[in-house]
């Protein structure tokens, strides 16, 4: 049987700061590669077909992100095995975030377009686990009267993350 938490139990100290930093990081994880880094890698890996190669890579990554978003939402909604004070979605974020980092790191060293494409698609799966679950973790953790504050944090850190990812 699930225990319904009170408003005081649902709002951990410093949650809003941690949430903002985490969401900022999740945006930088895809904004930097998509807007700057992958294009530069195409110039190196496929100079004669860089535009077509980048388009293919982004299309495959985008399709992976769409499908992954559906799967990650489904998986998180059925995570009955680790419901705690921080909800059932935060553990997915904590598991996937390091995998995003490892995937991006490996992408920077790949000498092959197809390996890069595979890694980018894998990173998209992990980014979906991080971003989608961060977007919905508020339902588990934050009292309803603070949803507007969290929405403002998402808007600010999203914009700042895009700028930071391309700077």
Map each language-model feature to its residues:
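Helix-loop boundary and gating motifs at the non-cytosolic
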Residues: 4-62
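Loop-to-transmembrane helix entry/capping segments in MFS-fold secondary transporters
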Residues: 49-55, 144-154
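Intracellular juxtamembrane helix-capping segments at the cytosolic ends
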Residues: 38, 129-142
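Central cavity-lining transmembrane alpha-helices of secondary-active solute carriers
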Residues: 55-78
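Glycine-rich segments within core transmembrane alpha-helices of 12-TM secondary carriers
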Residues: 61-66, 148-167
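Residue-level signal for discrete positions within transmembrane alpha-helices
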Residues: 27, 62, 101, 124, ...
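Hydrophobic core of transmembrane alpha-helices in multi-pass small-molecule transporters
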Residues: 24-28, 103-107, 113-130
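Structural signature of the two symmetry-related core transmembrane helices
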Residues: 87-105
